């Protein structure tokens, strides 16, 4: 009998083992769809980004008008740009839900997979930041100025690092050209990290909602989960196209319709919605270095999740107290996101400070304590 090409060919064998014959827990819920959705987001962003890069000019005098030209004169240029800009939002929605799933179901106990995942998040954040600067509108320019300036809080070498990153003494043409280069490079780095992420995941196999070993009861990925993933794609691409076609500027900042002007500061400098929670944490500390450290800690704290897991059960499925804390954390992040979009004045300052304190308290203190308490209550 002729050998099955799918199982013998060196390249097809890899595809087969990760997408076709992959043994998968039969009970993984829709929360396990976000990994493949992130893959689709990445593919869409690289494709639309490539098409945009063909019409973009990375020069301070031409960047703004080249983007306008793309939207006005290029065939479907407006659609490509709207899909790319809103695709970024969906990328972040998916990655935040994916991380939330990981925290809820204890997926972080696959340490290598979890750590590469955090590296993916950091790379995605860097990509989105440099990408936001490219249209060279007011918020692009001032966002770049404010965020790069944070590095000057590093003692002794900070100012040198900032001027090195800028390629001069302010955000200018060299900054824009290198940001374009980085924005082109980083998505491919994300793609590479994704392969590493999947390699580590396939070492252990997927976790499942019960958090128990499922080796005795697995089903092939195709057709069951390939079909389920396609349903997920449909359910994500529908709101994405709806947003891109009906209200493409809903999530953007109106300031960015004004070309960058170093002499006029916008009244409220704020990042895109997906960075607002971290921005609120940054602003909640009235000291520059302290704020920068808190900002870094707000994301890097995820590296500690595997070390802070004190429960004998893996998931939160049967741990009501931990569940309560988890959903308080989610609500807290939504409050931080809202506060980040508000001006720095009376009620918002104290709300932001309390929400920031709560964020770190839940992750560092309350969740581990609750895990230990639940062990005791269940006589483990």
Swiss-Prot record:
Protein name: Cytochrome b
Cofactor: record remark: Binds 2 heme b groups non-covalently.
Binding-site residues for heme b b566, renumbered to this chain: 98, 197
Cofactor(s) required for function per UniProt: heme b
Highest taxon in the source lineage: Eukaryota
Record family assignment: Belongs to the cytochrome b family.
Topology class, membrane: Multi-pass membrane protein
Main localization, broad class: mitochondrion
Keyword Nucleus among UniProt keywords: no
Keywords: Electron transport, Heme, Iron, Membrane, Metal-binding, Mitochondrion, Mitochondrion inner membrane, Respiratory chain, Transmembrane, Transmembrane helix, Transport, Ubiquinone
GO cellular component, one term: mitochondrial inner membrane
Residues the entry annotates as binding a ubiquinone: 202
Annotated source species: Fregetta grallaria (White-bellied storm-petrel)
Protein localization: Mitochondrion inner membrane
Residues that, per the record, bind heme b b562: 84, 183
Quaternary structure and interacting proteins, as annotated: The cytochrome bc1 complex contains 11 subunits: 3 respiratory subunits (MT-CYB, CYC1 and UQCRFS1), 2 core proteins (UQCRC1 and UQCRC2) and 6 low-molecular weight proteins (UQCRH/QCR6, UQCRB/QCR7, UQCRQ/QCR8, UQCR10/QCR9, UQCR11/QCR10 and a cleavage product of UQCRFS1). This cytochrome bc1 complex then forms a dimer.
Note: Heme 1 (or BL or b562) is low-potential and absorbs at about 562 nm, and heme 2 (or BH or b566) is high-potential and absorbs at about 566 nm.
GO biological process, one term: mitochondrial electron transport, ubiquinol to cytochrome c
Residue intervals passing through the bilayer: 34-54, 78-99, 114-134, 179-199, 227-247, 289-309, 321-341, 348-368
Role description: Component of the ubiquinol-cytochrome c reductase complex (complex III or cytochrome b-c1 complex) that is part of the mitochondrial respiratory chain. The b-c1 complex mediates electron transfer from ubiquinol to cytochrome c. Contributes to the generation of a proton gradient across the mitochondrial membrane that is then used for ATP synthesis.
Keyword RNA-binding in record: no
Gene Ontology molecular function terms on file: metal ion binding; ubiquinol-cytochrome-c reductase activity
């Amino acid at each position: 009998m002729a050998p099955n090409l799918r199982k013998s060919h060196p390249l097809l064998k890899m595809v087969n083992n990760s997408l076709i014959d992959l043994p998968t827990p039969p009970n993984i819920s829709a929360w396990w769809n976000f990994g493949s959705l992130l893959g689709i987001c990445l593919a869409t962003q690289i494709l639309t980004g490539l098409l945009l890069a063909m019409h973009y000019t990375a020069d301070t005098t031409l960047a703004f008008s080249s983007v306008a030209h793309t939207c006005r004169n290029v065939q479907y240029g407006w659609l490509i740009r709207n899909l790319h800009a809103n695709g970024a939002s969906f990328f972040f929605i998916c990655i935040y839900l994916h991380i939330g799933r990981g925290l809820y179901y204890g997926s972080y106990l696959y340490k290598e997979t979890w750590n590469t995942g955090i590296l993916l998040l950091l790379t995605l954040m860097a990509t989105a930041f440099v990408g936001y600067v490219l249209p060279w509108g007011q918020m692009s320019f001032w966002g770049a100025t404010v965020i790069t300036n944070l590095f000057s809080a590093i003692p002794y070498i900070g100012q040198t690092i900032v001027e090195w990153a800028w390629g001069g003494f302010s955000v200018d043409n060299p900054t824009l050209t290198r940001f374009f280069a980085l924005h082109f490079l980083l998505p491919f780095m994300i793609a590479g990290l994704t392969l590493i992420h999947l390699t580590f995941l396939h070492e252990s196999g997927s976790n499942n909602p019960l958090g128990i070993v499922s080796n005795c009861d697995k089903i092939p990925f195709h057709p069951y989960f390939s079909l389920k993933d396609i349903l997920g794609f449909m359910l994500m691409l529908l709101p994405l196209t709806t947003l891109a076609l009906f209200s493409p500027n809903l999530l953007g900042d109106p300031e960015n319709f004004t070309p960058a002007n170093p002499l006029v500061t916008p009244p409220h400098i704020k990042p895109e919605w997906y960075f607002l929670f971290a921005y609120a944490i940054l602003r909640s500390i009235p000291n520059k270095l302290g704020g920068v450290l808190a900002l870094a800690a707000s994301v890097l704290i995820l590296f500690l999740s595997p070390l802070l897991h004190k429960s004998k059960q893996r998931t939160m499925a049967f741990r009501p107290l931990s569940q309560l804390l988890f959903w308080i954390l989610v609500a807290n992040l939504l409050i931080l996101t809202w506060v980040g979009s508000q001006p720095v004045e009376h009620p918002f300052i104290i709300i932001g400070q309390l929400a920031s304190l709560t964020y770190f308290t839940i992750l560092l203190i309350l969740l581990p304590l609750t895990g230990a308490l639940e062990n005791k209550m269940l006589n483990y």
